[in-house]
Curated annotation (Swiss-Prot):
Homology family: Belongs to the bacterial ribosomal protein bL17 family.
Keyword DNA repair: no
Pfam families reported for this sequence: Ribosomal_L17
Subunit structure: Part of the 50S ribosomal subunit. Contacts protein L32.
InterPro entries in UniProt: Ribosomal_bL17 (IPR000456), Ribosomal_bL17_CS (IPR047859), Ribosomal_bL17_sf (IPR036373)
Protein name, as recorded: Large ribosomal subunit protein bL17
Source taxonomy: Bacteria, Pseudomonadati, Verrucomicrobiota, Verrucomicrobiia, Verrucomicrobiales
Length: 136
């Protein structure tokens, strides 16, 4: 019986799963959004939510716990200095999962997970085409 079991094993052993979640959390913190399978996104969501809640405390002990969890000082710095102040008013639900359909190669369900309160500057820069006219 699996009563009370909240985590998904993702077909990996414990150390591989821990490394996978740490790497994906680091990528999500640095980029703001990532595209992955739906199962990995659902497993990543509580992991990142706990990190953001930890970062909202802002003390040295929380910073050390976050560094021990994701092993990337650049991501920890961005988490504490940029993301945590943006999420200060929100009590939870810092991430959003958007289902994107199936992958063509293996029909795996693909989803995009993103941090809600981040500004969309990067997305707007990608969408706006550069209008440069050649003068001849």
């Amino acid at each position: 019986m699996r009563h009370g079991v909240k985590t998904s094993k993702l077909q990996r052993n414990a150390s591989h799963r821990r490394a996978l979640l740490a790497n994906q959390a680091c990528s999500l913190i640095l980029n703001g959004r990532i595209t992955t399978t739906l199962a990995k996104a659902k497993a990543l969501r509580p992991y990142v939510e706990k990190l953001i809640t930890l970062a909202k405390r802002g003390d040295v002990h929380s910073r050390r716990l976050a560094t021990a969890t994701i092993h990337n000082t650049t991501a920890v710095k961005r988490l504490f200095d940029e993301i945590a102040p943006l999420c200060a008013e929100r009590k939870g639900g810092y991430t959003r999962i958007v289902k994107l359909g199936q992958r063509l190669t293996d029909s795996a369900l693909v989803a995009m997970i993103e941090i809600i309160d981040l500004p969309r500057e990067a997305a707007e820069k990608e969408e706006a085409p550069a209008t440069t006219e050649a003068t001849a």
